[in-house]
Amino acid sequence: MNPVRKKRLIIVLAIVVGVGAAVGLALSALQQNINLFYTPTQIANGEAPTDTRIRAGGLVEKGSLQRSEDSLNVRFVVTDGAKEVTIAYHGILPDLFREGQGIVALGKLGGDGVLVADEVLAKHDENYMPPEVTKALKDSGQLKHYENGKAAGETSYNQEGK
């Protein structure tokens, strides 16, 4: 093989290896940032993976909010109308978090079926509900019940009355 051809081959191989490494790193980064959404029904049926970061959403069950008196630990139940999942969270809940409202929690599902959340997202005004939660409620037939309660002027408050 002549020197010019050998040099071109080395350059082409270096480019292929570089592009392959870049694609591999990009795919690895994207895979780590994927958070799949699961409804309480899917979680209760065992469809959600354990020890993997997931998103779970639904309506906060009325009367389910339990706050620790000596720490920022909070437990509450989220439902899609059919099944429920308990969520444990350590931190300050969003100002718009209320029982009976739609939320999305990000965290890892433990073997006991409790989602240990590291982030809780609440709807940002009275007319907004996360798209995943809306779809889950629509699929379970609970969206009409939720909308009827809002139309009748029903409001829900957390334990602090906010």
Curated annotation (Swiss-Prot):
GO terms for biological process: cytochrome complex assembly. This is Cytochrome c-type biogenesis protein CcmE. Residues 139-148 have a biased composition (Basic and acidic residues). Belongs to the CcmE/CycJ family. SUPFAM superfamilies: Heme chaperone CcmE (SSF82093). It comes from Pseudomonas aeruginosa (strain LESB58). InterPro entries: CcmE, CcmE-like_sf, NA-bd_OB-fold. Heme chaperone required for the biogenesis of c-type cytochromes. Transiently binds heme delivered by CcmC and transfers the heme to apo-cytochromes in a process facilitated by CcmF and CcmH. Residues 139-162 are annotated as: Disordered.
